Design a protein with these regions (language model features):
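C-terminal, non-catalytic "cap/extension" segments appended to globular domains
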Residues: 110, 115-117, 227, 318, ...
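A well-structured
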Residues: 1-278
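Long, K/E/R/D-enriched contiguous segments that form extended
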Residues: 261-290, 420-422, 427
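Catalytic Zn2+-binding segment of zinc metalloproteases
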Residues: 359-374, 395
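Short pre-active-site segment immediately N-terminal to the catalytic Zn-binding motif
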Residues: 280-284, 335-355
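Post-HExxH zinc-binding segment in Zn-dependent metallohydrolases
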Residues: 242-243, 368, 379-407, 421, ...
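Catalytic zinc-binding patch centered on the HExxH motif and its immediate surroundings
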Residues: 164, 280-282, 315-337
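Zn2+-dependent metallopeptidase catalytic core
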Residues: 237-251, 280-307
Length: 563
């Protein structure tokens, strides 16, 4: 069914909540394991129509935020979502209370029961008011960030609109863009500092209500991390600091040589090539045709997938007035259809977002067609879900010439270098947040001092050159995740470690790498991060010595592919 033919009906929330109560009672009383498994499929299906309606409303709203009808529908789901989420937690609580609960682990694998336990441990009626307060604090941050208008080049510009100026080949233009941005954040320094103080206090209070020492502990439950905790994450970060950072210093030296900027400062970092970044081919249809060819040649599975997506109008990727920024993939379970949303802007990022979201969508498409996989276990936790997308960016590389033409070698270098270099920043963000929540009484200046220490630890090549805002250690306040979804950022690092391994495997034997990826995808949300990596024969980055070899291979490839 084509997207425009999909019908929307606002769900009856009271009827859904009544169904939830019935399902919870039946889950608690199920007489044996078989009955419990059957009921799990039933409760999963019970939410399919609600999820489909909520996602249809969200897609229509984000595609045109000015449409009053879809705005009202989005408001409806925002208002009723918490009640539905609480009802789902109560169903989980009922399943867990059943003496036959082990049957779910036997049938579905490790993540089903572990995920329900995390849902129950991370939510409680006693934290509802604190959660509302946290949402309000995040909204205040979004207003400060989203409301930014700065003066540059005789124009009033938003923060995203500064992007082209930051990449200008003239260093004076770049510096002016960064100073304009810094001036805005410095002007709101007190508000941003105060908001973060309140956010740390709020989330630590939530943690203490639920019996945890601080939010750094609770976050592992809320992020549904299964099979690892703080010790494993610290072991990974330690390896990045010890084994990856020295390799990245070599990579940054190569970049300095390539760009002809011998002593780059912070404002020089966006310059990747002397003559500008790679540009994809122009034109929506030309790109869509290239994507169809690419996925037809990659595998029979992706050929079927891309035909379904394009034939059913399941892409909305062109930017236009009224459309929300960003990119995402979502699922419409009642139609077994993924949907991809993006905002192309004629940069190499257009190809990043296409291949990235197609990775998410392909996994969703495969899981939706597997009768063994219930709808709520189609997708794994975030650190694993991002493997599908990030690995797809690399596994489509043999066809990137279709999308970049003469610039395909530049794109290959840019993409691999960016992915590798990101590990250092991602680990700095994660370690910073652990320090903040474990030391909630730090003053704003002390917080900034901690950030500068981490910059030296993870990105020692950076010279802030007395730049306002960044130079005083406040650059972390630009990172939305730190305010909006604390402790999420390390997920990108964990998935990058898997994606880089798929990249290196594909250089040796692309077909073997693809078959390993397909195995991982087919496990859907039924396996943990560690289990998924083991399924594909990849190294788990928590193990001592697992990161060094990958880092050295990446440096060698980058050295051999300078353009």
């Amino acid at each position: 069914m084509k997207f425009h033919e999909m019908t929307y009906t606002r769900p009856d929330i009271n009827a859904l909540l009544a169904t939830c109560q019935t399902l919870a009672a039946r889950a608690a009383a199920a007489p044996d394991g078989d009955a419990l498994v059957a009921l799990y499929y039933e409760q999963s299906q019970a939410f399919a129509d609600y999820t489909t309606a909520s996602q249809l409303a969200n897609i229509h709203y984000t595609c045109d935020t000015r449409d009053a009808y879809w705005k009202a529908e989005q408001d409806f789901f925002d208002a009723n979502g918490p009640a539905v989420a609480n009802a789902q937690v109560e169903i989980s609580r009922a399943f867990l209370s059943n003496p036959h609960v082990d049957a779910l682990t036997h049938h579905f694998g490790t993540t089903c029961v572990a995920g329900m336990k995390n849902a129950v441990l991370g939510m409680d009626d006693r934290t509802v008011d604190l959660q509302k307060e946290f949402n309000a604090l995040v909204s205040q941050y979004q207003q400060i960030y989203g409301g930014a208008l700065v003066e540059l080049d005789g124009k009033q510009l938003t923060i995203p609109q500064l992007g082209p100026y930051k990449e200008d080949l003239d260093p004076a233009v770049r510096r002016a863009a960064y100073e304009a941005e810094a001036g805005y954040f410095d002007a709101h320094r007190e508000e941003l500092d105060q908001l973060y103080t309140q956010i740390v206090k709020n989330l630590n209070q939530q943690a203490q209500v639920l019996g945890y020492k601080d939010y750094s502990q609770l976050s592992y439950v809320r992020m549904n991390r299964i099979g690892y905790g703080q010790a494993e994450i610290q072991a990974f970060r330690d390896q990045v600091a010890r084994d990856v950072v020295p390799e990245l210093q070599k990579v940054m030296a190569m970049r300095a040589k390539r760009t002809g900027i011998p002593h780059p400062t912070f404002t020089d970092l966006p310059i990747i090539f002397k003559d500008g970044n790679p540009k994809p081919i122009p034109g929506y249809q030309a790109r869509m045709d290239a994507a169809r060819t690419m996925y037809h040649e990659l595998s029979p599975e992706t050929a079927e997938f891309i035909d379904f997506m394009q034939d059913n109008e399941l892409f909305d990727v062109e930017s236009r007035p009224g459309k929300m920024s960003g990119g995402y993939m979502t699922s419409l379970p009642s139609y077994k259809a993924p949907f991809i949303f993006a905002n192309w802007n004629d940069t190499s990022g257009d190809v990043d977002v296409l291949t990235h979201e197609c990775g998410h969508a392909f996994e969703g498409y495969v899981a939706q067609r597997d009768p063994h996989v219930p709808a709520d276990l189609e997708c794994p936790a975030m650190e694993s879900a991002e493997i599908h997308s990030m690995a797809m960016e690399f596994l489509t590389a043999p066809w990137h010439h279709l999308l970049f033409g003469k610039d395909s070698e530049k794109y290959a270098l840019l993409h691999a270098e960016d992915s590798f270099v990101f590990l250092a920043y991602g680990c700095a963000v994660d370690e910073f947040q652990h320090i903040m929540y474990q030391n909630p009484d730090l003053t704003p200046d002390q917080r900034n001092a901690e950030w500068l220490k981490l910059e030296k630890k993870y990105r020692p090549w950076i010279d802030f050159d007395n730049l306002p805002f960044y130079g005083r250690g406040a650059g972390w306040q630009r990172q939305l995740h730190i305010y909006e979804c604390p402790f999420y950022y390390i997920d990108y690092c964990l998935s990058t470690m898997a994606a880089l391994q798929f990249f290196l495997l594909s250089l040796e034997d692309h077909q073997d790498a693809w078959q390993r990826y397909l195995k991982l995808v087919r496990r859907a949300g039924l396996a943990s991060y560690t289990e998924l990596l083991q399924t594909a024969g990849l190294k788990v980055p928590f193990a001592e010595g697992s990161v060094k070899g990958i880092a050295q291979q990446m440096t060698q490839w980058l050295e051999a592919h300078q353009v």
